[in-house]
Amino acid sequence: MKKIGVILSGCGVYDGSEIHEAVLTLLAISRSGAQAVCFAPDKQQVDVINHLTGEAMTETRNVLIEAARITRGEIRPL
């Protein structure tokens, strides 16, 4: 089976990979008969955004851990 690498960067339209775009990309790869292999940088996000207000937050999040939300844990560090 052909494998296609997908690089994600966090999870969220303002501070990471846009969820709809990522999921539809993974679906298209699957429907084409290939296997998606997902990767993300294992580092802290530069900015964390409150998606309800659009304002920056002071907390920190890891890019790899946030991207794992989209892939349900099936992701490798870059």
Where are these regions (language model features)?
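Extended, subdomain-level signal for the structured scaffold at the beginning of enzyme domains
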Residues: M1-L78
